[in-house]
Amino acid sequence: MNHDIAEVHTTIAGGIGLITLNRPKALNALSLPMVQALLATLRAWRDDPAVLAVAIRGSNKIGRPGSPEALFGGFCAGGDIRFFHQAALAGDAALDDFFTEEYTLNHLIHNYPKPYIAFMDGIVMGGGMGISQ
């Protein structure tokens, strides 16, 4: 089953489940839909005999090739602070949902029964550390 969304791409090749965070303009900051997609993917792969290990990376380059911006990026800058700010001001329950789901994801990764490899290229902060462990 494929749980891809625009910001999270997944594939299985050679026994490796590969997750690519694809939100480079926001340094791959995590949104609630991204966290939910990661949870669904890792839960499915946990019991999939075709997946022997999992690797996660960021699509971490922004800007056109050859420009200074093309060298800048990150694995994951953590949670989406714009969302946090707007949700807090609005009293949006999605803010609580984000942290509940993110900590569930972190717990799943910490106890994952298969090798889990994070390619931490560039900026890694907050929730980026959580999904790298």
Where are the language model's segments positioned?
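Hydrophobic core positions within the conserved protein kinase catalytic domain
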Residues: 42, 106-109
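Short beta-strand/turn micro-motifs composed of small residues
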Residues: 57-58, 120
